[in-house]
């Protein structure tokens, strides 16, 4: 702070938060990025060690724990290890971290990864049920559409904006997306976006009003506990995605068993599933992925069709 740094994130007691993510964004102090790299290099071996600690010595595999209803939104949570915290391939040393998650039968099997396409925005489209917006998701460029509706000039900013908005970001956070510290700028962006999507404005108001009771209703009728009204929309959208993905998984497993395929589920992370698949069954599994998610759309009576993509490879680094 003596070098001119002003903290943006504080603890509940008012102390500045100084971690890897904060340090990596400080451009005017050369030492900051070096410290951030040091913290990263210290963290990665610790993560890898935690994976090795839970390897089953009999099977040679990691049998992680999945708690299917632990999260408020209905998402699955993970431990021993936390598979949701394995670094992504685009992260520093992320590719190397994901390459260690592989099949032990590379001559006959592959890792088959599939994930739901644009899940959050499709769930948003389901709830606001605006044909033009749904059409843009399915056939156009929804991020350019959002960019224009919010009055932004950069498509990448629009992507950051919409997901921040759905996660309950306020005017201050929204303003920071376009490099402003003025809350009024963020409020103007939000107001313009909502004025372009009146059904979203109405949906948001209804959800936040319902959240005053501490509960909101999910896609399948279940009740979600919410701590604050501004997080309620995120809980509804994320919860809908979690419900849909579980139905999708159930459908996939049903078809795998019916066809008698050599397929094993090896990881489930939010809207993504990783399987170990016999090379002879890759085409059939690809067809199942598409069929199962189409069935999910119909079973849940969704206003916006779901879709999925898949990749195959010898490691997780190649499939997601």
What is the meaning of each model-derived region?
Residues 1-4, 117-132, 147:
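Short active-site loop/helix that positions an aromatic residue
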Residues 1-93, 105-110, 117-120, 180, ...:
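Conserved "right-hand" nucleotidyltransferase catalytic core of DNA-directed polymerases
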Residues 6-8, 28, 69, 148-269, ...:
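Conserved catalytic core of nucleic-acid polymerases
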Residues 6-11, 128-140:
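Cytochrome P450 catalytic domain signature, combining two hallmark sequence patches
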Residues 26, 50-56, 87-89, 97, ...:
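Short, contiguous acidic/charged loop-to-helix segments that flank catalytic cores in large enzymes
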Residues 97, 107-114, 123, 133:
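Feature marking long nucleic-acid-engaging regions of large polymerase/nuclease enzymes
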Residues 120, 139, 143, 241, ...:
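Hydrophobic (often cysteine-bearing) scaffold residues that line and stabilize catalytic clefts
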Residues 291-300:
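A common structural junction motif
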């Amino acid at each position: 702070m003596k070098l001119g740094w002003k903290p943006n994130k504080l603890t509940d007691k008012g102390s500045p938060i100084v971690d890897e993510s904060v340090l990596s964004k400080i451009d005017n102090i050369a030492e900051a990025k070096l410290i951030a790299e040091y913290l990263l290099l210290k963290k990665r071996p610790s993560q890898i060690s935690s994976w090795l600690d839970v390897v089953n010595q009999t099977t040679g595999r990691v049998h992680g724990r999945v708690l299917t209803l632990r999260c408020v939104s209905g998402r699955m949570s993970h431990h021993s290890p936390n598979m949701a915290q394995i670094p992504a391939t685009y992260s520093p040393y992320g590719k190397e971290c994901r390459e260690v998650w592989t099949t032990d039968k590379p001559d006959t099997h592959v890792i088959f990864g599939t994930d739901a396409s644009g899940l959050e925005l499709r769930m948003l489209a389901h709830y606001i049920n605006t044909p033009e917006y749904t059409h843009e998701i399915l056939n156009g460029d929804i991020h350019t559409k959002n960019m224009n509706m919010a009055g932004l000039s950069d498509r990448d900013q629009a992507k950051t904006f919409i997901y921040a908005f759905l996660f309950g970001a306020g005017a201050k956070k929204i303003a920071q997306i376009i490099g402003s510290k003025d809350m009024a700028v963020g409020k103007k962006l939000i107001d313009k976006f909502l004025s372009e999507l009146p059904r979203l404005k109405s949906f948001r108001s209804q959800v936040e009003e319902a959240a005053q009771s501490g509960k909101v209703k999910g896609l399948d009728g279940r009740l979600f506990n919410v701590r604050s009204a501004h997080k309620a929309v995120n809980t509804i959208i994320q919860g809908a995605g979690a419900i849909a993905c579980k139905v999708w998984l159930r459908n996939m497993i049903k078809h795998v068993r019916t066809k008698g395929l050599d397929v094993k589920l090896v990881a489930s992370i939010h809207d993504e599933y990783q399987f170990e698949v016999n090379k002879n069954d890759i085409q059939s599994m690809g067809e199942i992925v598409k069929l199962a998610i189409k069935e999910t759309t119909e079973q849940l009576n969704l206003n916006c069709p779901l879709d999925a993509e898949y990749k195959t490879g010898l490691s997780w680094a190649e499939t997601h």
